[in-house]
């Protein structure tokens, strides 16, 4: 895909595979920063997870993470957050069309999320932990598809080189 063509996909639906680590939080909502709080997970079970997921389907108000590229007075939010400055971002409307629990083991959930442009999966992980009366952060993230383009149809660099130079 050419750079120019990539812009037309930005507004399209995206699908992600993610792993949330339950029982802890980080300031960045992912593994980029150290754990800042530990929570009990003894009350969390598969049924509770399934009930919690229902709260994340449809239109939602989401507050982006402080560690994001959103600009505040000309500076990236993450630059301010890394300096320890207090960052306050406004909530945004997002839409989650699917949230599928794939696996639950060792206080980690693997899930598949289909969502709108502007959705921060890190914020979903953090909010998910709050809904469980625990904590959570994003441990792993893979964008599976955007619009009709998916990883299954993507070329590896090796395959692309062979196509171009053979």
Predicted regions and their residues:
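Catalytic/RNA-binding core of pseudouridine synthases
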Residues: 4-166
């Amino acid at each position: 895909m050419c750079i120019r063509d990539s812009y037309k996909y930005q507004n399209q639906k995206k699908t992600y595979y993610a792993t949330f680590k339950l029982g802890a939080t980080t300031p960045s909502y992912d593994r980029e920063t150290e754990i800042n709080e530990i929570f009990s997970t003894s009350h969390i079970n598969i049924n509770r997870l399934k009930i919690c997921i229902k709260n994340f389907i449809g239109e939602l108000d989401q507050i982006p993470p402080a560690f994001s590229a959103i600009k505040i007075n000309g500076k990236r939010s993450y630059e301010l957050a890394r300096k320890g400055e207090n960052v306050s971002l406004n909530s945004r409307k997002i839409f989650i069309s699917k949230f599928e629990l794939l696996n639950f083991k060792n206080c980690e959930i693997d899930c598949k999320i289909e969502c709108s442009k502007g959705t921060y999966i890190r914020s979903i992980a953090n909010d998910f932990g709050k809904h469980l009366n625990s904590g959570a952060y994003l441990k792993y993230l893979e964008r599976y598809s955007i619009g009709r383009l998916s990883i299954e149809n993507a070329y590896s660099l090796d395959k692309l080189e062979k196509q171009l130079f053979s």
